[in-house]
Amino acid sequence: MLNEFKQFIAKGNVMDMAVGIIIGAAFTAIVTSLVEDLINPIISLFTGGLDFSGLGLALTEGEEAAVFAYGNFIMAVINFLIIAWVVFLLVKMVNRIKEMAENEPEEAPAEDPGPTEKELLMQIRDSLAKS
């Protein structure tokens, strides 16, 4: 499943990308809350109170110093991975449904029932009449 996820991220058709954009936009608030309110506190618990959102490197000194805020980037990456995983699962489900629909056996055409009883009797009569 992880290899399929890697392949999905590495390549995809336009439909996959469209689904990703739509689902990503719809789940942005939910995923952001998930990361900020649930995942980060758990990570913080195991890292001794480390908060990713506050991580950064001050490039200059002063009140309005330029900051290289790599903590926010880490949070954005986590958000992206969660959204991409959800989209991957959705596309995988859609592909499975399409595959099941394609593999459904089509109704076999009705077999030729052959001549009716009346037709058979007529053939026998004609054969007897010729002899």
UniProtKB/Swiss-Prot annotation:
**PANTHER family with a match to the protein in the record:** LARGE-CONDUCTANCE MECHANOSENSITIVE CHANNEL, MECHANOSENSITIVE CHANNEL MSCL
Chain segments annotated as transmembrane: 14-34, 71-91
As for what it does, the entry says: Channel that opens in response to stretch forces in the membrane lipid bilayer. May participate in the regulation of osmotic pressure changes within the cell.
- Record bears the keyword Transport: yes
Q: Keywords on this record?
A: Cell inner membrane, Cell membrane, Ion channel, Ion transport, Membrane, Transmembrane, Transmembrane helix, Transport
This one is known as: Large-conductance mechanosensitive channel
Membrane topology category: Multi-pass membrane protein
InterPro entries referenced in this protein's UniProt entry, alphabetically: Mechanosensitive_channel_CS, MS_channel, MSC/AndL, MscL_channel
